[in-house]
Amino acid sequence: ASTTLLTGYTGILDELLKAGVTNSAVCLSRLRANGFQGGKTIVKDYIAAHQHLVPPARYAVAPQGNRGRRYTTGPGEAYQMDWGFTKVSSYAGEEYSVACFAMVCHHCGEQYVEFFPNAKQENLFIGMLHGFRYMGVPQYILTDNMKSVVIRRDQEGNPLWQKDYEQFMRTVGFQTKLCKPRHPFTKGKVERLIRFVKDNFLAGRTFWNVTDLNLSALDWCDEQNTTFHRGLGIPQDIHRERCGTVATKLDDSPELLLYFCPERRISFDGFVNYEGRRFGVPYTYRGKTARVMRSGSC
């Protein structure tokens, strides 16, 4: 048998294909992380010749129809945000569900993603604040009609904000605009980002826990934001030059610290549950309420 650049790496490719990963860029990235020296063409050819390894699609997407005018904004004017839900593989061979918070600058495409065990409002606030630290605070956020943001609309169609979210907007200093009901494609950039996270970042990867997942996600965001995109450029450079002059720096006030540190009840045996893990505290604090914040690599 002849020897090629893929010799010794076909096992990795086969496992990716069996997991449904057919994106050549993703496969090439995984191979290069293991020492592969070849290019994308040979990887594409291998994928095309081994389509029988790819599991069949479970359903086909129906035609979406006319989506109206393209939504455009100025530099630093608006970010889009949304939740996505997916499963992540651990090194223990288990799968667990996570909520993916995604935020993207509508003008330049700079992106930020973070993962949480669920999509509760306290996690929405933490994800938004981390996104604002990463990209600055825009004039307004574009999102859909999630219950943690808006209760309902009045007879004139004006939103009735959820009271805690309304206070959060005042504290941070931004406004919120909502998509029309059943028109999620208005925020198509963040919808595509969530799909890209699932198909690119998560494809074929395993993580120890949510902390390991978020550290890897931040590195991935840095990589994507400093990569040249045809027709756009380098998002990070554009964001600094144009959007950074409009978006304001997040002021770490004492009021914001309360959003970073949600309350937790200390159990009778001296443990605090946070993000699916238990942390021990001195036994004398049992039954009391504490505030917990994720920091660094903890």
What residue ranges belong to the model's regions?
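RNase H-like two-metal-ion nuclease catalytic core shared by retroviral integrases
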Residues: 143-144, 155-156, 176-198, 213
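Short small-residue beta-strand/loop micro-motif enriched in glycine and branched aliphatics
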Residues: 109-114, 150-151
